[in-house]
Design a protein with these regions (language model features):
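Residues that mark the N-terminal boundary/hinge immediately upstream of a DNA-recognition element
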Residues: 7, 19-20, 46-49, 60
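Alpha-solenoid HEAT/Armadillo repeat architecture
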Residues: 13, 40-43
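Short alpha-helical DNA-recognition segment
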Residues: 16-37
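Short, charged recognition helix plus adjacent turn
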Residues: 1-2, 14-15, 37, 55, ...
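DNA major-groove recognition helix of helix-turn-helix/homeodomain DNA-binding modules
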Residues: 29, 48-63
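Key DNA-contact positions within bacterial/archaeal DNA-binding proteins
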Residues: 32-36, 43, 62
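A short, Lys/Arg-rich alpha-helix, primarily the initiator
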Residues: 1-17, 23
Length: 66
């Protein structure tokens, strides 16, 4: 995944208004713990989670995982 954790954090922080990790994860349909681990690079998200994240940010999977 390379720079995925940093990209994910920057996507969340670039949204206006800026939302907390808890609110963002709930809107995505993920648990706050899962999003936290993805942003820290502790766990790589599975395809299901990647699709939820990409849909939330209105970007393609390619853009998300580049």
């Amino acid at each position: 995944m390379g720079e995925f954790p940093e990209r994910l954090r920057k996507l969340r922080e670039s949204m206006r208004p800026v939302r907390s990790m808890t609110v963002t994860s709930q809107l995505m349909g993920l648990s706050p713990d899962a999003l936290r681990k993805y942003e820290r690079g502790e766990v790589e998200p599975k395809m299901t989670a990647l699709k939820l994240i990409a849909a939330y940010y209105h970007i393609s999977l390619d853009e998300l995982c580049k």
